[in-house]
Design a protein with these regions (language model features):
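Long, contiguous juxta-domain segments that are non-catalytic but functionally important
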Residues: 7-8, 45-74
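N-terminal presequence-like segments and adjacent domain-start helices
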Residues: 24-56
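Terminal low-complexity, intrinsically disordered regions
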Residues: 1-35
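Short glycine-rich, basic-tinged beta-strand/loop micro-motifs
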Residues: 38-47, 83-99
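Acidic, proline/glycine-rich low-complexity IDRs
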Residues: 1-5, 85-87, 102-134
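Short edge beta-strands and adjacent turn/loop segments
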Residues: 33, 67-91
Length: 134
């Protein structure tokens, strides 16, 4: 029997700043990097370390995206400046697709209605899921 030990999500409330940063970095490297491609990896990692509450949500999002889009698709994480965001920066989860715009938007709409809108408050305005046409 093989046991796999998964790191616990980082918690700023129970750890010092340095411990929380190290825990977030471990979580990013072991749980998030294998699931996503990072555009400007340093910027994405820094953003995730500053917003560790997104890390478990990203793991769950990957599973849900695979249910609605091609399972072999590797979503992309990119930090984008959004003038409507409180600090102007937001993490975008971009789902690459070769679908027609109608089909891709239909899939995204189903993902939104059946999962994303229910968990959206957990993202605290720091994460958006969208499609990217290939």
């Amino acid at each position: 029997m093989t046991f796999v030990v998964k790191p616990q999500p980082p918690s700023k409330t129970t750890q010092s700043g340095q411990e929380a940063g190290a825990a977030a970095l471990l979580w990013i490297r072991s749980m998030v990097e294998p699931l996503y491609d990072f555009r400007r990896p340093r910027e994405v990692s820094t953003f995730l370390q500053a917003h560790p509450f997104l890390l478990p949500l990203l793991v769950e999002a990957h599973e849900k995206i695979a249910e609605y889009f091609e399972p072999s698709t590797k979503p992309i994480l990119e930090v984008i400046t959004d003038p409507e965001s409180e600090d102007g920066r937001e993490l975008f989860v971009l789902v690459p697709t070769h679908d027609t715009p109608e089909e891709a938007l239909s899939r995204l709409e189903r993902l939104d209605q059946e999962w994303w809108l229910d968990v959206l408050p957990q993202a605290l305005g720091k994460m958006t899921i969208d499609v990217e046409y290939c």
